[in-house]
């Protein structure tokens, strides 16, 4: 029979293995997200149903490890993104892999900076506001990663002057990414906007993972991503 000390040591060993595995998954997620994507092929095949959209994410070395600038824009107006965010993959001890979702104050200042390192470097933690209820819960799969906006109908967005809650999911692989976003009425749960023809299918066009600073990898291995959040202890 094992002594209490042996049981405690065994438990600590298992927890260390789980933490190491989660840290490695976090680093893989950050690397996989650090890329540019386009659904050009899908848009050209189905022009009535899908616009040609660019999704571009690049590391922000001046912010906490994992922080990525996201710009989402129509290809015909690539420097006028309709969505600008900072995403930060991290690990929560009780919830596993998460992607925190930040709004940027006066985000128009940074339009197009995904392709402009100098302007990108001016983004600071003071410019960010965490969007409560809009984090993505992520799990690793055989093909890559799958994520969904956390449950609770708390991720509120406004489109055309009407408030809705967001239901969003994605699948990320070596080849690309599929996403689906839909908005629902908070009172009636009626579907208000979003794809009715199925997910957007994006192909990976550029890899930006070489821009990930080495100290991020070191810090994430040491902390497990649990004390991150651009100034917040999460």
Show the residue positions of the predicted features.
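Short N-terminal edge-element motif at the start of the domain
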Residues: 18-80
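Calycin-type beta-barrel ligand-binding domains and close structural analogs
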Residues: 2, 6, 23-36, 40-42, ...
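N-terminal amphipathic/basic-hydrophobic helices that include classical n-h-c signal peptides
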Residues: 1-16
């Amino acid at each position: 029979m094992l002594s209490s000390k042996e049981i405690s040591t065994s438990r600590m060993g298992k927890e260390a293995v789980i933490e190491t595995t989660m840290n490695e998954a976090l680093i893989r997620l950050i690397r996989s997200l650090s890329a540019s994507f386009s659904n050009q092929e899908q848009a050209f095949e189905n022009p009535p149903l899908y616009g040609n959209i660019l999704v571009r994410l690049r590391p922000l070395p001046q912010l906490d490890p994992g922080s990525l600038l996201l710009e989402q824009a129509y290809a015909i107006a690539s420097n006028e993104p309709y969505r600008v965010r900072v995403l930060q993959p991290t690990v929560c001890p009780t919830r596993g892999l998460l992607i925190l979702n930040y709004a940027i104050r006066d985000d128009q200042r940074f339009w197009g900076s995904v392709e402009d390192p100098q302007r990108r470097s001016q983004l600071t933690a003071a410019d960010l506001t965490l969007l409560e209820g809009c984090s993505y819960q992520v799990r690793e799969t055989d093909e890559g990663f799958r994520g969904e906006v956390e449950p609770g109908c708390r991720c509120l967005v406004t489109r055309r002057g009407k408030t809705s809650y967001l239901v969003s999911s994605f699948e990320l692989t070596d080849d690309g990414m599929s996403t689906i976003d839909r908005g629902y009425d908070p009172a009636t749960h009626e579907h208000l906007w979003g794809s009715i023809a199925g997910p957007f299918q994006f192909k990976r066009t550029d890899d930006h993972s070489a821009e990930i600073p080495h100290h991020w990898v070191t810090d994430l291995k040491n902390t497990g991503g649990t004390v991150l959040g651009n100034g917040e202890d999460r």
